Amino acid sequence: MFSLQDLCRKNTFFLPNDFSKHTLQRLGLYWKEHGSVHRIEKDSIMIQNELVLSINDALQLAGEEGDTDVVQLLLLWEGNLHYAIIGALKTENYNLVCEYHSQIQDWHILLPLIQDPETFEKCHDLSLGCDLICLLQHAVKCDMLSILVKYKEDLLNVRIRHRTQSLFVLACENRRFEIIEWIGQNLSIPEPEAIFSIAIVTKDVELFSLGYKIIFDYMQRQGIFQLTNVVRMLLLNRHIGMAIEKGLLPFILETLKYGGSVKRALSYAVIDNKRKIIDYLVRHENIPRGTIERLLHLAVKKQSSRKTLNLLLSYINYKVKNVKKLLEHVVKYNSTLVIRILLEKKKNLLDATLTRYVKDSTYFQVKEFMQDFSISPEKFIKIAVREKRNVLIKGISEDIWENPAERIRNLKQIVCTIKYESGRQFLINIIHTIYQSYSLKPEEILKLATFYVKHNATTHFKDLCKYLWLNRGTESKKLFLECLEIADEKEFPDIKSIVSEYINYLFTAGAITKEEIMQVYALEYAMY
């Protein structure tokens, strides 16, 4: 038989305003004390053409009122029966509950949908065979702290006190922080350490920190905070070891906030070859030089990896006497690896140390280091270019090469050895500032111009061209032709454009012929 309810279930539309209450009742689209009801979307209804509710909210309301007709209608519209039963339980409309009881296989499924603790408990009571512990477990899962508070005395009872541990673990696994804190303040937890293991496995720093709050608050309430300092440090050190093993830096930092030993953390990190942790702690915890040396000795003793040893070595300025002191330790533990690093890779060690000097030290400190280790100017300047320390480059190069022309010649040679473009341009900029600060001989300026062309230093080349044209005029003809040839060969269009402009000036001044231009690049300048 044709059913209007079926039609409404398949379609969304507005009811005509002229439908009477009697008509709506006959159609089954009238909700007592609310008015007309119709479906407007897949999961929404409208009451009296005004109020919009989700189907499940409407089901819960209908369940509270015990209106089985509306419940049936909303179920036709794909509502969730669980909400109707929750509503019925709230107002104790057990007739409706009994009507649909057989359709519920497991009453625990409804519990996460319930916000009211009384209704929560009523629903759980329908699960035959379940006890108080089952109720408390689901209360923890669903974050129903008020239920645990209600049964606090039962939890303190010696008969079920041992179940506190399982509730505590369950709360930790489900991140129920309020419940965890309440248990810590009100109940006795046999093994509170479980919170830290769970936090590390799940990488939950917030849970990890809460564990310390629970334990240390308990110690303070009991007046044993100072008496158990040794136990406290053992606890912190154990957690540092757990965090180091998993490589969890945020957990280590959290432990340090509660009094953990940074030296212990570094020792564990050295043994486990956790280089990122070592590097972070050394840089952010102001670790003394002596401590780093002891860590290096520990790394030798524990046969740490090459990368760990190299990292520790890079923090220290190792002059000859320091290396000899270290060798005494490595020989004692027969660490051939570190011997190979120091003897075979000494160059790399110096590079790493020099890089740190260039990055963080003053001109005088860098100069002293270069003298102590006979560091070549070229090596220093290439590192300084990488770190963008132009002041150091100018100072050291001026100190080594007093003559500006010699300084520029040596810096130009270094430019040719730098493999990355940004580094070459950085050093070329420094060369140009030297040129601007001194009066160079014409032949040096001409060499500098061709150097700029070869490295596509457009701005600096343009600056030199202006100087050459103003001061040498047509005497620069040979230079411009040479620069044109280089620019064309290397395909530097901006340089070619600049050179072409000055060749045009030369041509206009009669200082250059069409034939001379075409000898260089006939096709490019056939227009002449």
From Swiss-Prot:
Keyword terms: ANK repeat, Host cytoplasm, Repeat
Ranges for the ANK repeats: 54-83, 129-158, 261-290, 292-321, 322-352
Coiled-coil annotated residue ranges, if any: none
Pfam families named in the record: DUF249
Gene Ontology CC annotations of this record: host cell cytoplasm
Inducing stimuli: Expressed in the early phase of the viral replicative cycle.
Principal cellular location given in the protein's record: host cell
Keyword Ligase: no
Top-rank taxon: Viruses
Family under the similarity heading: Belongs to the asfivirus MGF 505 family.
Function: Plays a role in virus cell tropism, and may be required for efficient virus replication in macrophages. Interferes with host NF-kappa-B promoter activity mediated by TLR8. Mechanistically, inhibits the phosphorylation and subsequent nuclear translocation of host NF-kappa-B RELA subunit downstream of TLR8. Promotes the expression of the autophagy-related protein host ULK1 to degrade host STING and inhibit the interferon response. Inhibits also JAK1- and JAK2-mediated signaling and thus negatively regulates the IFN-gamma signaling.
Subunit structure: Interacts with host STING1. Interacts with host JAK1; this interaction leads to JAK1 degradation. Interacts with host JAK2; this interaction leads to JAK2 degradation. Interacts with host RELA; this interaction inhibits NF-kappa-B promoter activity.
Name listed for the protein in its UniProt record: Protein MGF 505-7R
